[in-house]
Amino acid sequence: MKFVDEALIKVEAGKGGNGCLSFRREKFIPRGGPDGGDGGDGGSIYFEASSDLNTLIDFRYTRQYKAENGQSGMGGNCTGKKGEDLTIKVPVGTMVYDADTGELLADISQPGVPVLIAQGGFHGLGNTRYKSSVNRSPRQTTPGSPGESRNLRLELRVLADVGLLGLPNAGKSTLIRAVSSSKAKVADYPFTTLHPGLGVVRVSPYKSFVMADIPGLIEGAAQGAGLGHRFLKHLSRTCVLLHVIDIAPLDGSDPVADAKAILNELTQYNPDLLNKPRWLVLNKIDMLPDEKEREEKIQSIIKGLKWKDKVFSISAIESKGTQELCYALMQLIDEMKESEA
């Protein structure tokens, strides 16, 4: 599924119903008093998180949402019907911003809990409300007020347990395809992943975690170069980061220098990301069939990065070492979630 992480929409709450101007007119009661009823309140617009959704793609096709207007009041002191509220379902983790001011209106992270985004208009008052001892036949009413109207920017941060980090063509898309049901676009040129993608990795019938395939970064991404820093934000909610490195780049670049460039981007964008658990994944070991040469390359990378945390050597395209990696990730995620409970 194509993963869309931003959308611009317009929402408009319902207008309140107008108050009614009416007088009681019945046989043998020639001068009945006022009996104009109030209007109904306009419908409000709520956002609600749904765990069944994981994309904002629907908002690319429907951009305008309007709640029902309140009904106007009627004679006989009948109040108009309230406009029906509109509840818009969004994926868990959706951030709702006012597109005009940039204000964060809501972080929709709890499924099943409606969050008010646009308040419906207040009902108008009928002429009955203005009856007094000095004005027995008021002709005054008030109209219903308009509902709130907002231009919104929806932003979805990937709710994933594992984030894949690395330069373009490090093999992240291949890895996520190898261990999950994700069908990420894979080819031998940079930026094959143009949208963040999610893959569910199932290590047993009752154990699974979500892996986020973040588009490849280049030097300067924190300032918006390449595919820009818009993708770095997807790493903020992951439990663990996998730093995927191409052990034998076809362009002859230095894997250590490549890795340091990514770490530099992380530091510039958000230094707190460096405090997350980060594991080193040395990919494409199939490109170095000689065992001695491969081991020397692995050790030189570890030494060059002064890496102290876990290291996994894999071939994503041949699924070598991926099972061990997934079991280790599942164990870490379980431990982290237990400690938070």
Curated annotation (Swiss-Prot):
Tell me which InterPro entries the record gives.
G_OBG (IPR031167), GTP-bd (IPR006073), GTP-bd_Obg/CgtA (IPR014100), GTP1-OBG_CS (IPR006074), GTP1_OBG_dom (IPR006169), GTP1_OBG_dom_sf (IPR036726), OBG_GTPase (IPR045086), P-loop_NTPase (IPR027417)
Please give the Gene3D superfamilies that the UniProt record associates with this protein: GTP1/OBG domain, P-loop containing nucleotide triphosphate hydrolases
Name the Enzyme Commission number(s) assigned to this protein.
3.6.5.-
Q: Which domain of life is it from?
A: Bacteria
Q: Which CDD domains match?
A: Obg
- List the GO cellular component terms: cytoplasm
Q: Where is the composition biased (Polar residues)?
A: 129-144
This protein's record includes keyword Membrane: no
Q: Where does GTP bind?
A: 166-173, 191-195, 213-216, 283-286, 315-317
The entry sums up its family as follows: Belongs to the TRAFAC class OBG-HflX-like GTPase superfamily. OBG GTPase family.
Quote the protein name from its UniProt record.
GTPase Obg
